[in-house]
From Swiss-Prot:
Record keywords, A-Z: Chloroplast, Cytochrome c-type biogenesis, Membrane, Plastid, Thylakoid, Transmembrane, Transmembrane helix
Subcellular location: Plastid, Chloroplast thylakoid membrane
Domain of life: Eukaryota
Species, as recorded: Galdieria sulphuraria (Red alga)
Keyword Membrane: yes
Entry's family note: Belongs to the CcmF/CycK/Ccl1/NrfE/CcsA family.
Gene that this sequence comes from: ccsA
The protein, known as: Cytochrome c biogenesis protein CcsA
Length: 306
């Protein structure tokens, strides 16, 4: 009977995971169709439905593990990927509700889709199984520290991807800023406007502002996550900072986005230069989250690839 229940629970989890991935994949296609055919509002509504469905199923998967095993499911790579996928979809829905712009979904849905695909189809099955918590993780700081860090990653990834999109769309165009931080066109030596399409200019301005706002929201979460991690480390290992690879790259991530926010204050750095910094931050976030774990070294290497 116990084996039967375990198999049934595994099948339900597997179905929920597959449906979540399919929903996110469909939403990604729908968002791209909305970009291609702006007047087809049906695609946008259906995309919202699919993202909401995936979000609810991810809540179920996380809540089930939490209730069954009596600790919040953030103890290994698989569980953190589920939580990151949920964070991405939740933040996407909140930002779309707040800013009313389809570009957010078009950017966020591919990340959440690929993140969930990695957890579902690329991680070996043994890494998806629940294992007993090591003593250092048996703390209330597990929920506080890891969840806040992953939420910050979700915001920073979406914001930095928008900056990358800004760079792709603005290449070969010279852009200036007004006093209100709005993009304006620049002219060449013949006084011919480099950027002639006013709609494209408005689009670039929207993307740039969205990126700035979202990264501005994610940075405080990253700061709180690092501070809470330092406090937890002192309780668990007797030291606030050990220059562990994960700690070091978290600090590098913080510095990169601090530089980005500082460049937004300096008018000469706004636009493409600040977007380059944010684009570099996109890579650094993934190195901090996944890349460091391939080393298999340090205090944060448990429950990951080795």
């Amino acid at each position: 009977m116990l084996t039967l229940n375990m198999n049934l629970n595994y099948q339900i989890d597997n179905y929920c995971l597959n449906i979540s991935f399919l929903s996110l994949f469909i939403s990604m296609i729908c968002y791209w169709l909305v970009i291609a055919f702006p007047k087809k509002i049906f695609f946008l509504k259906f995309a919202h439905f699919e993202v909401s469905l995936a979000n609810i199923l991810l809540v179920y998967l996380l809540a089930y593990r939490w209730l069954k095993y009596s600790y919040f499911p953030l103890s290994n790579l698989y569980e953190s990927l589920l939580f990151l996928s949920w964070s991405l979809t939740t933040i996407q829905l909140i930002l779309e509700f707040k800013f009313k712009h389809k570009l957010i979904g078009a950017i966020a849905s591919p990340i959440s889709t690929l993140t969930l695909a990695f957890s579902s189809f690329f991680l070996p099955k043994y890494m998806q199984e629940v294992s007993p918590l090591i003593p250092a993780l048996k703390s209330n700081w597990l929920l506080m520290h890891v969840s806040v860090i992953l939420i910050s990653y979700a915001m920073l990834l979406i914001g930095s991807l928008l900056s990358i999109l800004f760079l792709l769309l603005s290449r070969n165009n010279k852009l200036n800023y007004t006093k209100n931080n709005n993009l304006t066109t620049a002219s060449n030596s013949n006084d011919t406007l480099i950027l002639k399409n006013e709609d494209k200019l408005n689009l670039l301005n929207t993307i740039d502002n969205l990126s700035y706002r979202i990264i501005g929201l994610g940075f405080p979460f990253l700061t709180i996550g690092i501070i809470s991690g330092a406090v937890w480390a002192n309780e668990a290992w007797g030291s606030y900072w050990s220059w562990d690879p994960k700690e070091t790259w978290a600090l590098i991530t913080w510095i990169i986005f601090a530089i980005y926010l500082h460049t937004r204050i300096n008018k000469s750095w706004q636009g493409k230069k600040s977007a380059i910094v944010a684009g570099f931050g996109f890579v650094v976030v993934w190195i901090c989250y996944l890349g460091v774990n391939f080393l298999g070294k340090g205090l944060h290497s448990y429950g990951w690839f080795l």
